[in-house]
């Protein structure tokens, strides 16, 4: 049997039991996809990140309990946290190659800063399954890798009680529900039952779509965001050209061994 080290990190959090938990599994070389998927399913967290050293950085992949995905912000933040805090990465920036291209994470002042691609959405017709799934009609809907449903008030986001069966009928990965915030610039929630995530606690990748939208609406490049899941999470977002910089903290919850 092969022994692997496994970490669990609460990302976009300053204390345990908040933010978004992610499993991180460093590898010396790639295991078969069925094994990676098996580990992620056994972990049963929203995402498990795996990375392998490549040149002067790393190749990273992310799996939900159901499938591999193209981009995951909080598990990337968690992976960088492990490299900086546990694996003695001696530089201020760690770079990752992924299915979504080149990503990097930089040590900031008491935070980690993700450098991700901006993913602006395109206005689209409101899918029937989206309205059935959210239980109400948004003021507008945009599409990219996910649908983004925009509402008028923060309370609209708080009170959503989604029909998950209806949301699984959508053709895209999931639904970001968002509105202007009261004491932050914008708030959101994220639902992706199609890939095994009923509600994600804090979704870094969703802010690649949220940030360009709200930067234009509010006419500001630096934004404060809050995800209104039960665990909640705080993010700093900045739009610079075609890149989005997402900042947050992380804390270690678990370190252990698995045998496969």
Model-derived regions, located:
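Active-site proximal loop and beta-alpha junction motif in alpha/beta enzyme cores
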Residues: 1-71, 77-260
């Amino acid at each position: 049997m092969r022994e692997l080290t496994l970490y669990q990190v609460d990302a976009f959090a300053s204390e345990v039991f908040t933010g978004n938990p992610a499993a991180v599994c460093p590898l010396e070389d790639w295991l078969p996809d069925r094994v990676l998927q098996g580990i992620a399913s056994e972990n049963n967290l929203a995402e498990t990140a795996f990375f392998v050293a490549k040149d002067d950085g790393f190749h990273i992949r992310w799996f939900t309990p159901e499938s591999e995905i193209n981009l995951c912000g909080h598990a990337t933040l968690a992976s960088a946290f492990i490299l900086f805090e546990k694996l003695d990465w001696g530089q201020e920036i760690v770079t990752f190659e992924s299915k979504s291209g080149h990503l990097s994470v930089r040590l900031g002042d008491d935070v980690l800063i993700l450098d991700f691609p901006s993913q602006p959405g395109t206005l689209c017709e409101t899918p029937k399954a989206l309205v059935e799934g959210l239980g109400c009609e948004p003021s507008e809907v945009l599409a990219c890798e996910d649908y983004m449903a925009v509402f008028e008030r923060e309370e609209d986001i708080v009170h959503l009680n989604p029909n998950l069966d209806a949301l699984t009928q959508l053709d895209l990965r999931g639904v970001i529900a968002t509105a202007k915030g009261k004491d932050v610039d914008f708030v959101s929630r994220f639902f992706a039952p199609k890939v095994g995530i009923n509600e994600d606690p804090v979704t870094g990748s969703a802010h690649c779509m949220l940030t360009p939208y709200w930067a234009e609406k509010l006419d500001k490049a630096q934004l404060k965001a809050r995800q209104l899941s039960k665990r909640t999470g705080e993010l700093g977002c900045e739009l610079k050209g075609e890149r989005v910089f997402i900042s947050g903290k992380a804390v270690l919850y678990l370190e252990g061994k698995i045998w496969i």
